[in-house]
Amino acid sequence: KNSTNNNTRLTNENNLESTITNNNVTKNISSNSTINNDDNPVLEQKYSVETGTVFKINTKEKKLFNEQGDEEMVDLSSSFNPQKVEFMKAGGSYAIVFGKKLQSFACETLDIELKSAYAPSKEVYHPGQGLTAVEKIFNANALGVKKGSILHSGSDVRVKVNIVGSQDTTGLMTSQELEAMAATVISPTVDGAYQSGCHTASVWDFKAQENTPKLMKFMHKFGLITARDPKEAYHSMTDVIHKVLNDITVDDWSIIIGGDSHTRMSKGVAFGADSGTVALALATGEATMPIPESVKVTFKGKMSSHMDFRDVVHATQAQMLKQFGDNVFQGKIIEVHLGTLLADQAFTFTDWTAEMKAKASICISEDDTLIKSLEIAKSRIQIMIDKGMENDDKMLHRLIQIAEKRISEIKSGEKPALIPDNNAKYSAEVVVDLDLIDEPMIADPDVNNIDVSKRYTHDTIRPISYYNAEKKVDLGFVGSCMVHKGDVKIVAQMLRNLEKTSGKVSFKAPLVVAAPTYNIVDELKQEGDWSILQKYSGFEFDDNSPKQSARLDYENILYLERPGCNLCMGNQEKAAKGDTVLATSTRLFQGRVVEDSSEKKGESLLASTPVVVLSAILGRTPTIDEYKTAVEGIDLTKFAPPIEKAQNTSSAHF
């Protein structure tokens, strides 16, 4: 009665793992309940999920039982939809996925109606209801549904995948999956695909030397653009995968699949996935998934000049929790209206939606802004071509053609930038008041909260004044997919400011800076910003002599590390055990960036670039006045709420 086949993939929002864990908490509101740090009752487990606990899944009753089978834990019926049961019966998903694709192709070729023997797609339609942005994208990319069908959230369908990303720590598993399904070449329907080398960029150790070239050779032969050339025809690139995927996504109607939870592009809609789903997307150009509900996020008010856009991102989470009490983003699509920001800056928001526990996110952009973003994408793809990264199939050239076509459609008015219908239905609507954001915001792991469930989440957002300039900072880190070129320029500008006022700059804590891409480093060198970073650095990466082992000890200096994930990933290098780290990165989980010591818990707090830089210089969190002085004259962000326009309710153009 227990299904344990590794190829049975229950990766939709109702998968077994989330069903088991999300239904396992209860709030004791009795008078004798324990109160946590936020004056709320501590959440309690209904049953243990400690390592070693044994459960039995009864697939006939669709329920989870204890080891003895005499006590029901939770109902799992939502995980046993017809499509998933079909996978179980087949002993895995591959035969079903390929069978559906072959059958659809045959019917299209013969121009006959599809009468499938497989479980039909679940189609949900509400007459008179408009479409959210993600519903429009799914409708445009849906496969195996009747022509003219309109799909709303709750539908579960096959969709065309436009862009696929594989990263270097899960890529080996993806290659094994491709070999297992006897796939030898990428699907011709995939517009673009990239294999990164960013997660193992920090240290070129024995493991990386053994695995990375083998992975790159396989993926290059399969048809992906690869960060390293198997024949070393071009300089090895360790650019952060999400930045590259954001650049090669050249259509705001795209669906993107990537082997990482931060696959959350600011053009199109992107989903992080397991290695098997990535392999299927590469081999078939398809994925099967439900259309999630959407939460609409808009902004009002005006940003203070001393605030960074990262503070808007954190404030969104804080204001949402204050407005609703519970996290309304969880498992949903966040449809964020950031029309005035270019794709690079907008990605700072869409990327963080992983920490908001959203299923994915979609950025609503204005026509002129989207055109500028696509022009930037074109130029960066051309740089990849100039470096020799193009493959035999001319994938990068085709991406430029797609971008040019999309720009032409927007300019002519034939197909403007994607927007939702004004009568679309949302599960919730969040309005972020920019006037309420007057000081930097920090995401705190709250490692000593009496409620264990409240530790190491991203929901504890605190203003900098909370720390009274007394929070010791042992290491600062500016890097990860959350930052862009503007962030590294801010580091340089702050050093110049402090040099003018103090004569020199010294650090009371180590500051590690890792630009996410080589393009950024090259542009900073041309613009004169890299030289000020070099002036104060005690270490600068050297591609001719990469580090062979992880750094164990840090001095109070500026480190200019190789582009890539660096400390954010935590798989190669970490801060010293027990350190308090202040970083621009994404994760604050226990043991990720810093492990506990025998004397003190390690903690990774997350903040904006200027807060991290200043804290490393001071060795502590700054006062609000110290912060304002340090960023004076620096243009931290150009974000302003987009002006609402009358929307066309017609969805015919998808």
Question: In which residue ranges do the predicted regions lie?
Answer:
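Fe-S-dependent hydro-lyases/dehydratases of central metabolism
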Residues: K1-F654
